[in-house]
From Swiss-Prot:
SUPFAM superfamilies: ClpS-like
Protein name, entry field: ATP-dependent Clp protease adapter protein ClpS
A Pfam family per the record: ClpS
Function text: Involved in the modulation of the specificity of the ClpAP-mediated ATP-dependent protein degradation.
GO terms of biological process kind: protein catabolic process; proteolysis
Highest taxon of the lineage: Bacteria
Family according to the record: Belongs to the ClpS family.
Quaternary structure, from the entry: Binds to the N-terminal domain of the chaperone ClpA.
Length: 102
């Protein structure tokens, strides 16, 4: 095997080992008790949405039962879900944040 062929095989092997991480949707679920303003605050604080984006997502949550806050690799999505759920409980709201594979 020539040196060039060997290098090409190594490059192909390395490329095959690197996969894009699985992505996950972070979702806010509607409930009858959490104020709309609090949902907007969550979207701005944890997902860096501007007021217009946050309002659009909040209305989707209100009308459709859930809304996508963002799509992230698993570790980031899991952390955001935990942060949002903890913040909601600290503020005595039943808001539920969850994740699902994108």
């Amino acid at each position: 095997m020539s040196r060039t062929e060997n290098i090409e095989q190594i490059e192909e092997s390395v490329e095959a080992e690197f996969k894009q991480p699985s992505m996950y949707k972070v979702i806010l679920n509607n409930d009858d008790y959490t104020p709309m303003d609090f949902v907007i605050e969550i979207l701005q604080l944890f997902f860096k949405k501007d007021e217009q984006q946050a309002t659009e997502i909040m209305l989707a949550i209100h009308h459709k039962g859930k809304g996508i806050c963002g799509i992230y690799p698993f570790g980031i999505a899991e952390t955001k879900v935990a942060q949002v759920n903890q913040f909601a409980r600290q503020n005595q709201h039943p808001l539920l944040c969850s994740l699902e594979e994108a």
